[in-house]
């Protein structure tokens, strides 16, 4: 599963998922087809990997897949049945902060029917509503 090799700080604030992914990451850059998020959410590294595997399995050897998101936010948890106080919990897993219209996966080198079916399977593994988008012909 994906995680950063090194970070400046071990723990982060939870933050807010306000706003829309306006400029960065909401256009198709590499492939012809993509899976686009429609809701804000935290997507864990396990969910990202599950979606990637689903697309890879369906597309077989044909085509190429680009994962456009990376889990760079540590989520901390405290042990069960622990009393209040004594600091913040230790990092348990990593998430990627997703805002609406963010591109999650891109595909190229396959037909539209294959890409649509593969992204539909990957979308089922995501905790948010998504849509299938195609690159506009230039």
Swiss-Prot record:
The keyword Ribosomal protein applies. PROSITE patterns: RIBOSOMAL_L16_1 (PS00586), RIBOSOMAL_L16_2 (PS00701). Residues 7-21 have a biased composition (Basic residues). GO terms for molecular function: rRNA binding; structural constituent of ribosome. Belongs to the universal ribosomal protein uL16 family. PANTHER family: 50S/60S RIBOSOMAL PROTEIN L16 (PTHR12220), LARGE RIBOSOMAL SUBUNIT PROTEIN UL16M (PTHR12220:SF13). This is Large ribosomal subunit protein uL16c. It comes from Cycas taitungensis. The gene is rpl16.
């Amino acid at each position: 599963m994906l995680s950063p090799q090194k970070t400046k700080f071990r723990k982060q604030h939870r933050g807010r998922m306000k706003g829309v992914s306006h400029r960065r990451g909401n256009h198709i850059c590499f492939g012809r087809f993509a899976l686009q998020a429609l809701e804000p959410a935290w997507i864990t590294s396990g969910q990202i990997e599950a979606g990637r595997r689903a697309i890879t399995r369906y597309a077989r050897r044909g085509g190429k897949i680009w994962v456009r998101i990376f889990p760079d936010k540590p989520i901390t948890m405290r042990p069960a049945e622990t009393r209040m106080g004594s600091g913040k919990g230790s990092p348990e897993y990593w998430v990627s902060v997703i805002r609406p219209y963010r591109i999650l996966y891109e595909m190229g080198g396959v037909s539209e029917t294959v890409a649509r079916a593969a992204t539909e399977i990957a979308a089922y593994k995501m905790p948010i509503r998504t849509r299938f988008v195609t690159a506009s012909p230039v």
